């Protein structure tokens, strides 16, 4: 049965306030950037020419209205975005070190994204997508946590491949133990997932990327990607594992790097139009290289969503050996 959407995602949609220099008097300046890992991921999918939609909640405020308009401009179907006048849009303040690595401070007590109820979800979006993508930030608080599980079950019932990116953000969890428990709780439903080499010990008994990926495959996940920062990514499937080197970048801001990689990688899985078990490790390596090219371009600009490159730029980067 043909599906209307290639990827539908559920989760946080927020503002990343990223450093943008200082005033003449030395006060810090911050730039308003649309962000949120699921939407960054969808944007990368859309750059590959595929159809996407987002499910989430924003506040009926200047930030929420800006986010809805930004999603529309990115070609993301916004019918699943709830605009609520009783809560504020979630805000993230990002600080960057000399290597472009980030630390976060959040205004989310509660943020609109945590207040999404299942009765507000357009179930047609769940039933009409090839891939349904989630992160773990919708698992931090109720009612969004229950909504996430209900949405995953519904999408799965209608044949969607379930995609998961834990995207651990320590300040948003009450403690590490709860974070680990809840991030693991979704694994029985997951078909494909991406995690970073800093998250392996949170989701598995292993820190080593290869051991962690093999453990996840053993739990029933069908394809695992472990991002390794500037070193690239490790891809693991039933056909084997392979480390795929990254591209040399002039790093400005790593926000959205993993999201853009995963969106680009998943877009290639969808384009190939095969079941997950049919992919050889050689094919997956090719898709990972495409994803690495997208991520390498993403980190050369500030912000997440708006730093994701056009596909023509990606093809140009892919010519670099």
Q: Language-model features: where?
A:
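Glycine-rich phosphate/adenosyl-contacting loop at the front of the ribokinase-like
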Residues: 1-77
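Conserved N-terminal subdomain of the carbohydrate kinase-like
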Residues: 51-134, 315-321
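Conserved beta-alpha-beta core of the PfkB/ribokinase-like small-molecule kinase fold
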Residues: 140-214, 231-232
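Conserved phosphate-binding/catalytic region of the ribokinase-like
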Residues: 1-6, 153, 209-321
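Glycine-rich phosphate/pyrophosphate-binding beta-alpha loops
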Residues: 16, 90, 136-140, 295, ...
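Active-site metal-binding loops of divalent metal-dependent hydrolases
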Residues: 13, 37, 137, 166, ...
């Amino acid at each position: 049965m043909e599906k209307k959407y290639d990827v539908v995602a559920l989760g946080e949609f927020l503002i990343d306030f990223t450093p943008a220099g200082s005033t003449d008097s030395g006060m810090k300046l911050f730039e308003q950037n649309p962000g949120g890992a699921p939407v960054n991921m969808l944007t990368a999918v859309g750059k590959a020419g595929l159809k996407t939609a987002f499910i989430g909640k924003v506040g009926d405020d200047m930030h929420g209205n800006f986010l809805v308009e930004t999603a529309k401009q990115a070609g993301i179907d916004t019918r699943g975005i709830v605009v609520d006048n009783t809560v504020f849009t979630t805000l993230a303040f990002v600080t960057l070190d000399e290597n472009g690595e980030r630390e976060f401070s959040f205004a989310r007590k509660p943020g609109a994204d945590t207040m999404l109820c299942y009765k507000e979800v357009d179930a047609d979006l769940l039933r009409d997508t090839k891939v349904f993508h989630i992160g773990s930030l919708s698992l931090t608080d109720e009612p969004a946590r229950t909504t996430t599980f209900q949405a995953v079950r519904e999408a799965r019932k209608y044949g969607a491949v379930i995609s998961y990116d834990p995207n651990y953000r320590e300040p948003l969890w009450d403690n590490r133990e709860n974070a680990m428990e809840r991030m693991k709780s979704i694994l029985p439903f997951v078909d494909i997932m991406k995690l970073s080499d800093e998250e392996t010990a949170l989701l598995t008994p292993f820190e080593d990327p290869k051991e962690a990926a093999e453990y996840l495959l053993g739990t029933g996940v069908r394809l695992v990607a472990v991002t390794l920062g500037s070193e690239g990514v490790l891809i693991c499937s039933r056909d084997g594992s392979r480390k795929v080197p990254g591209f040399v970048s002039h790093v400005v801001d790593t926000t959205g790097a993993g999201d853009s990689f995963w969106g680009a990688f998943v877009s290639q899985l969808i384009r190939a139009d095969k079941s997950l078990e049919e992919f050889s490790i050689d094919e997956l390596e090719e898709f990972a290289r495409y994803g690495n090219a997208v991520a390498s371009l993403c980190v050369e600009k500030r912000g997440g969503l708006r730093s994701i490159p056009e596909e023509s730029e990606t093809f140009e980067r892919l010519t670099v050996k």
